Amino acid sequence: PAYNHLMIGDEEISAEGQAIKRYTSDGNFTGDVIGRGIFENQPEGIALWQTGEKTGYWIFTDQGIDLNQYLFFDRQSLEYVGAIKGTITSNTDGIWLDPVSSLRFPKGALYAIHDDGNATAFSLAEIADALGLNLP
């Protein structure tokens, strides 16, 4: 990728809180820790929403047994830009981002596993509107 980022969820519970650790694509830890103090539960699913050659958003699942939230960070600055929650989806281990336009999802969709058995789809257009994200 453009910034040589490899994101790994750190599920270890510590006084500092759980977070995402950034590595280079060859496996070297950069020292950057993302989302500490923002995650309420375990960091799980990770997806990159690429909106341009060097723009977009990292999406991280904050996995809760009762309800998840999906945290969005700017691809370039790695700054937190907001979160969304589904009304049902919980206990998500994995997410998948499909940026391809369809009739139902004109800007694509974010798919999340619900409780190890079903999938939920979130409209990327609705997410962008809710969080005030810039899309091409």
Q: How should each PLM-predicted stretch be described?
A:
Residues 91-136:
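Blade-level signature of beta-propeller repeat domains, shared across WD40, Kelch, NHL, RCC1
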Residues 30-36, 80-87, 131-136:
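Beta-propeller fold detector
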Residues 8-9, 36-81:
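Loop/turn-rich, solvent-exposed surfaces of beta-rich toroidal or solenoidal domains
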